[in-house]
Amino acid sequence: MSILIGYIILLACAFGLAAGLFFGLSLIKLI
C-alpha cells in the first residue's frame, strides 16, 4: 500500500515538473 502511495507521489512530482517546464517555456515565448 505504501509503495502505491510513493508511486502516486512520484507521478505527481513528475507531472508538476513537466507542467512547470511547459509554463516556463510559454512564459519565455510570451516575453
UniProtKB/Swiss-Prot annotation:
Q: Which positions form S-S bridges?
A: none
Q: Which GO terms describe its cellular component?
A: chloroplast thylakoid membrane; cytochrome b6f complex
Q: What are the TM regions of this chain, as residue ranges?
A: 3-23
What are its GO biological-process terms? Answer: photosynthesis
Q: Which family does it belong to?
A: Belongs to the PetL family.
Under the subunit heading, UniProt states:
The 4 large subunits of the cytochrome b6-f complex are cytochrome b6, subunit IV (17 kDa polypeptide, PetD), cytochrome f and the Rieske protein, while the 4 small subunits are PetG, PetL, PetM and PetN. The complex functions as a dimer.
Protein's name according to its UniProt entry: Cytochrome b6-f complex subunit 6
